Amino acid sequence: MIKEIKIYDEIIEVTNKNLVMIIAKSHTCSSCNTIANTMDNNMKHFDKIEKFNVFVDDNDRFRGEFLIFSVPTVLIFSEGKELLRQSRYFDYAKIDRLIEMFSS
C-alpha cells in the first residue's frame, strides 16, 4: 500500500530509512495514478520497501529541493541516498533489479 506524505520534514525523515520509494504526482496528472498503482502491484513481493506518494502541487519545497520537473517521477532512496530517479518512461525491470539488490 502506498501512503501519502504532505509535510516536507516527513519526506526527509522517510528518505533516511533503509529502502523507500517516493512517487511524485500531481492532482492534474491523469497517468500518475496508473503509474502509482502499477508500481504498488509490481512491488508487492518486496516487503522491505516502503512506498509513498507526494503531490507536488501541495509541496513546492519538495518539488524544488528534489528537482522534480515532471510527473510522475519515481525516486528510490536508501539511507538518505538517491539510488534511482525515473520520469515519464519507467523501466520496471530495472526498478525490480535495484530493489532486489538492496533488499537482500
Walk through the language-model features, giving the residues of each.
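N-terminal leader/targeting and pre-domain segments
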Residues: 1-19, 100, 104
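Thiol-based oxidoreductase modules, predominantly thioredoxin-like and allied folds used
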Residues: 2-5, 24, 40-43, 47-61
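Chalcogenol-based redox active-site neighborhoods
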Residues: 3, 34-37, 65-66, 97
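Local sequence-structure signature of Cys/Sec-based thiol-disulfide redox active-site neighborhoods
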Residues: 9-42
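Short alpha-helical
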Residues: 30, 58-61, 90-93
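Structural micro-motif
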Residues: 66-75
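Non-catalytic, surface beta->alpha helical segment in thiol-disulfide oxidoreductase systems
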Residues: 76-104
